[in-house]
Regions:
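Short, thiol/selenol-centered motifs that function as redox-active sites or metal-ligating centers
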Residues: 38, 61-69, 108
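Flexible, solvent-exposed loop/hinge segments and secondary-structure transition points
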Residues: 26-29, 35, 54, 60
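C-terminal binding/interaction regions
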Residues: 1-26, 30-31, 49, 81-85, ...
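Immediate flanking context of iron-sulfur cluster ligation sites
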Residues: 52-62, 96-99
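Short beta-strand elements
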Residues: 40-50
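Alpha-helical support elements that line or immediately flank enzyme active sites
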Residues: 66-81
Length: 140
């Protein structure tokens, strides 16, 4: 017997009408993460200006509705922010912004956080930058 998962209105809105879908040509940073547990793959693209402000961000996600919704919300939350502020993005903040996630889908918000941090890591590596608090991407 399958279990019915209930999503918040905000999750359904971001799944049905995701923001920032696509790729950025010549991105400043790209982060790709995946989770073998449920098969979700997220890729976040960043366009960062000379003042370390995220001018634009896009995502491509292969996965469930919660994975798409968390990717969409995460990109909305970091667009226009500094690299330093984007680094503070947490999976809890993504969940809260979406009005919560079912317990079995919390890992999707963690993937969104990890994808953003992986893209920031890629940006730092490409530009030979040391960014306080930035850690190498998590490998699943």
């Amino acid at each position: 017997m399958s279990q019915i998962i209930e999503y918040s209105e905000k999750v359904m809105e971001h799944f049905s009408n995701p923001r920032n879908v696509g790729e950025i040509e010549n991105p400043s940073g790209v982060g790709t993460v995946g989770n073998a547990k449920c098969g979700d793959i997220m890729r976040i693209y960043l366009d960062i200006d000379e003042n370390q402000v995220i001018r634009d961000c896009k995502f491509k996600t292969f996965g469930c509705g919660a994975a798409v919704a968390t990717s969409s919300m995460a990109t909305e939350m970091i667009k226009g922010k500094t690299v330093e502020d984007a680094l503070k993005l947490t999976n809890e903040a993504v969940q809260e912004a979406l009005g919560g996630l079912p317990a079995v889908k919390v890992h999707c918000s963690l993937l969104a956080e990890e994808a953003v941090h992986a893209a920031l890591w890629d940006y730092a590596e490409k530009n030979n930058l040391q960014i306080e608090g930035l850690k190498p991407p998590v490998q699943h």
